[in-house]
Swiss-Prot record:
Gene3D superfamilies found in the cross-reference section: Homeodomain-like
Protein name: Homeobox protein unc-30
Species for this entry: Caenorhabditis elegans
Gene Ontology terms: biological process: anatomical structure morphogenesis; axon guidance; dorsal/ventral axon guidance; GABAergic neuron differentiation; positive regulation of transcription by RNA polymerase II; regulation of locomotion; regulation of transcription by RNA polymerase II
Tissue: Expressed in D-type GABAergic motor neurons at high levels in young larvae, in which the motor circuitry is formed, and at low levels in older animals. Also present in six non-GABAergic motor neurons and is absent from the seven non-D-type GABAergic neurons. Expressed in DD GABAergic motor neurons and VD GABAergic motor neurons.
Region annotated Disordered, chain positions: 83-119
Membership in a protein family: Belongs to the paired homeobox family. Bicoid subfamily.
InterPro entries: HD (IPR001356), Homeobox_CS (IPR017970), Homeobox_Pitx/unc30 (IPR016233), Homeodomain-like_sf (IPR009057)
Name of encoding gene: unc-30
Phenotypic consequence of gene deletion: Aberrant synaptic connectivity of dorsal and ventral D-type motor neurons onto ventral and dorsal muscle.
Function according to Swiss-Prot or TrEMBL: Transcriptional regulator within D-type neurons that controls terminal differentiation. Required for the development and function of the 19 inhibitory GABAergic (gamma-aminobutyric-acid-secreting) D-type motor neurons, which control locomotion. Plays a role in regulating synapse formation in dorsal D (DD) and ventral D (VD) GABAergic motor neurons, possibly in part by regulating the expression of the neural regulator oig-1. Also required for expression of flp-13 in DD motor neurons.
UniProtKB keywords: Developmental protein, DNA-binding, Homeobox, Nucleus, Transcription, Transcription regulation
Length: 323
C-alpha cells in the first residue's frame, strides 16, 4: 500500500511539472537540479510497474500543435496570389503597348503590322526600266535607285525580289504554253501526205492519176509487151490502128500495137503543160514531143518490114538508128 502511494505521488509531480512547461524539450533545459526527481525515487516508483504492468492505464499526452507556426506561410501564399492578380489587372487595363502601335490580346502583345508601300507611277516606271536592264542589282545599285526615286534600300530590295518571282512565274507559264503548241504542230506534221492532198484539189489529182495510168498502158503496148494479163486492149482516142503479126507458124500470138499519132502525143503533153505553165517546162515538153515523132517514124519502118516478111521464119532485127 505504501508503495502504491509513493508511485502515485511521483506521477502527480510529473504531471505538474509537465503542465508548467508546455514544451517538454524546453522544460528539460529549464529545470534545475532542485526540480529533478532523485534517481532512487524514480526507480522505486517504476519498480511496481515492472511486476504489474496492468496496474493502471496511463498515456503520456502529446504536445499541442501550434497553429501559429503555419500562419506566416499561408500569409505569404495569399500575398503572392494577390500580386499576380494585380499584375494581370494592370496588363488587361492597358490596351496599347509602350510604342502605342500594338494591342494586347489575352495578355500577349501582338507585333505591329507593317504598312504597305504605295509606289507612284514614276517610281514604278523607273523600277521597271532598271529591272529590264538588270534583274539582280547589287547593294550599290539598289542604293542608287533608292536615292533616285526617293525610296529606302530595303523597299527597293523587296520590290526586286517580288518582281523576280513574278517574272519566273510568267516564264514558266510561257514555256508550258509553247510546249502545248509544239505538240500540236508535231501531230500535224506526222501526216505530210494528208497535208499535201489537202493543198491540191481532188480533180487535179484524179486527172494526173488517170494520165499516169494511160501512159503506163501506152508504153507497154507501144514497145510490144502485150500479155494475157491485159483483159481489155487499150484504144487511143484518135487514129486507132491494129496490127495482127504472126511471128511463128506453129505458135500464133496476137500482139496489139497502137502507134501514137503526133497529135495525140501533143495533146497529152499540152494538157500537162497547162497544169504547170512555165517557159522551161514548155521547152522540155516540145523537145520530148520531137523525140516521140522520131520514134514513131522508126516504128512505122519496122512495121512495114515485118508486114513484108510474113510467112517467113522469125529473124531478130538489127536496130541501127537512135532509139
Amino acid at each position: 500500500m505504501d508503495d502504491n502511494t509513493a508511485t502515485l505521488t511521483a506521477i502527480h509531480q510529473q504531471q505538474q511539472s509537465h503542465n508548467r512547461f508546455s514544451n517538454p524539450l524546453v522544460c528539460v533545459g529549464q529545470l534545475d537540479h532542485h526540480s529533478l526527481l532523485p534517481e532512487h525515487s524514480i526507480s522505486s516508483s517504476l519498480a511496481p510497474l515492472t511486476h504489474n504492468p496492468y496496474a493502471f492505464n496511463y498515456s503520456i499526452p502529446l504536445p499541442p500543435t501550434d497553429i501559429t507556426t503555419k500562419l506566416p506561410k499561408l500569409e505569404l501564399l495569399s500575398l503572392d496570389v494577390k500580386q499576380e492578380q494585380d499584375d494581370n489587372h494592370l496588363d488587361t487595363s492597358s490596351p496599347t503597348d509602350s510604342t502605342g502601335n500594338g494591342s494586347t490580346n489575352g495578355g500577349k502583345i501582338q507585333k505591329p503590322r507593317r504598312q504597305r508601300t504605295h509606289f507612284t507611277s514614276h517610281q514604278l516606271t523607273e523600277l521597271e526600266n532598271w529591272f529590264s536592264r538588270n534583274r539582280y542589282p547589287d547593294m550599290a545599285c539598289r542604293e542608287e535607285i533608292a536615292v533616285w526615286i526617293s525610296l529606302t534600300e530595303p523597299r527597293v530590295r523587296v520590290w526586286f525580289k517580288n518582281r523576280r518571282a513574278k517574272w519566273r512565274k510568267r516564264e514558266r507559264n510561257y514555256v508550258i504554253d509553247n510546249g502545248q503548241g509544239t505538240t500540236k504542230v508535231t501531230a500535224q506534221s506526222l501526216d505530210p501526205l494528208g497535208s499535201l492532198q489537202n493543198t491540191f484539189p481532188q480533180t487535179l489529182l484524179q486527172s494526173s492519176s488517170s494520165q499516169l495510168d494511160d501512159s503506163a498502158v501506152t508504153s507497154s503496148s507501144f514497145y510490144g509487151y502485150g500479155g494475157a494479163w491485159q483483159q481489155n486492149p487499150y484504144y487511143s482516142r484518135n487514129n486507132q490502128t491494129t496490127f495482127n503479126w504472126q511471128i511463128k507458124p506453129q505458135d500464133q500470138f496476137q500482139f496489139q500495137t497502137i502507134p501514137m499519132s503526133p497529135t495525140t502525143a501533143t495533146s497529152r503533153f499540152s494538157t500537162a503543160a497547162n497544169l504547170a505553165p512555165l517557159p522551161t517546162a514548155q521547152a522540155a515538153f516540145s523537145t520530148s514531143a520531137t523525140s516521140s515523132n522520131d520514134k514513131l517514124k522508126l516504128m512505122d519502118g519496122l512495121s512495114n518490114s515485118l508486114s513484108s516478111s510474113l510467112g517467113q521464119p522469125y529473124q531478130p532485127c538489127q536496130y541501127s538508128g537512135p532509139l
